[in-house]
Amino acid sequence: MMKTLLLLVGLLLTWDNGRVLGDQAVSDTELQEMSTEGSKYINKEIKNALKGVKQIKTLIEQTNEERKSLLSNLEEAKKKKEDALNDTKDSETKLKASQGVCNDTMMALWEECKPCLKQTCMKFYARVCRSGSGLVGHQLEEFLNQSSPFYFWMNGDRIDSLLENDRQQTHALDVMQDSFNRASSIMDELFQDRFFTREPQDTYHYSPFSLFQRRPFFNPKFRIARNIIPFPRFQPLNFHDMFQPFFDMIHQAQQAMDVNLHRIPYHFPIEFPEEDNRTVCKEIRHNSTGCLKMKDQCEKCQEILSVDCSSNNPAQVQLRQELSNSLQIAEKFTKLYDELLQSYQEKMFNTSSLLKQLNEQFSWVSQLANLTQSEDPFYLQVTTVGSQTSDSNVPVGFTKVVVKLFDSDPITVMIPEAVSRNNPKFMETVAEKALQEYRQKHREE
């Protein structure tokens, strides 16, 4: 008799495939009501995701407007910088024509300047740059022997540095523009779609995207070119067919931005001394010109800069002053261009980051491939509710809820008993935890 009673108790506790909460059975009707409440939360999150996508689209457009404004400023600064560089080169050419005037004086000073410059540079390199001192020393000696004191006198190193900087700046902007143009052509087509100009409706009841046929904005030669929204009015929503082309395009746009943006060879000047030292080390290894920046530490080198040849050629004073003025202007606009270029690059990275967010939003929604494939009307279906009394694996003080979300395998979530089954927040908490796990799983795939 006792065995029979125990058997009956066991059957009651496992009634209807384990759909029990302690000793109280959870009926099919209750499970259906819970599924309905949970699905409402999922529906709200889908709508939020779609709104989020549009918000990111708006941010991308705002960033693009800021980028255009910066590009206009860059073009203006570039024109002024190039004018100053041309003036500098003209002044340099005129000065070169009179370089023999003080040649003997300069050569004598140059012979005393070179040993000090080499020693100062090699000490710096050994202390800061460290690697390859022997090779650099040999290269530096050749460089100094081939250099002219007149080049030193008219700040040829500053001129060459400006010209090299100009070349690198132009290349950096070309790389960024190429990246943006590739991404922009994709985004232009993406954002022309009617989806981005309409408010998201209630996805739980009908497809908000099937009310109108989409115009063929995409180039028919594209692999993904097709009618993205071919669904007739009120046909159930299929997220995969709807969003996968969008998802593919966003991924392509992000790749187009990232591939080149992270390979820009130009390094923006940074105020910190250790960063400046790295730049000087690179210049010394490259062609020894970095050593000329140490001329202020050698007295005889400074004397070369102070040589006055005006007694032999009065016009040279004016030419040298013109060169000095144009150099200062060119350096000023080069620095301004650097600052604008760096801001421009930051805008590009911001756009890339926003595309990444857009990618993540679409990634989740576009994974809902079988959302309406089954006859089940619920996004979220509760299959089992249990507690520690009905399942020894459930921690004390928790309620175990097993759900199916979309086409997923069963997902188990634990809800603190402080949030009771009668609490309106119960199913919202269940749905939130289940959705977090669902999204995490798809991020890992």
From Swiss-Prot:
Set out the biological process GO terms recorded for this chain's protein.
Answer: chaperone-mediated protein folding; immune complex clearance; intrinsic apoptotic signaling pathway; negative regulation of amyloid fibril formation; negative regulation of intrinsic apoptotic signaling pathway in response to DNA damage; negative regulation of protein-containing complex assembly; positive regulation of apoptotic process; positive regulation of intrinsic apoptotic signaling pathway
**Which cysteines link up through disulfide bonds?**
102-309, 113-301, 116-298, 121-291, 129-281
Known glycosylation sites = 86, 103, 145, 277, 287, 350, 370
Keywords for the protein's UniProt record, in alphabetical order: Chaperone, Cytoplasm, Cytoplasmic vesicle, Disulfide bond, Endoplasmic reticulum, Glycoprotein, Membrane, Microsome, Mitochondrion, Nucleus, Phosphoprotein, Secreted, Signal, Ubl conjugation
* UniProt similarity note: Belongs to the clusterin family.
The annotated subunit structure for this chain is: Antiparallel disulfide-linked heterodimer of an alpha chain and a beta chain. Self-associates and forms higher oligomers. Interacts with a broad range of misfolded proteins, including APP, APOC2 and LYZ. Slightly acidic pH promotes interaction with misfolded proteins. Forms high-molecular weight oligomers upon interaction with misfolded proteins. Interacts with APOA1, LRP2, CLUAP1 and PON1. Interacts with the complement membrane attack complex. Interacts (via alpha chain) with XRCC6.
Q: What does this protein do?
A: Functions as extracellular chaperone that prevents aggregation of non native proteins. Prevents stress-induced aggregation of blood plasma proteins. Inhibits formation of amyloid fibrils by APP, APOC2, B2M, CALCA, CSN3, SNCA and aggregation-prone LYZ variants (in vitro). Does not require ATP. Maintains partially unfolded proteins in a state appropriate for subsequent refolding by other chaperones, such as HSPA8/HSC70. Does not refold proteins by itself.
Q: What is this protein called?
A: Clusterin
Q: What is the lineage of its organism?
A: Eukaryota, Metazoa, Chordata, Craniata, Vertebrata
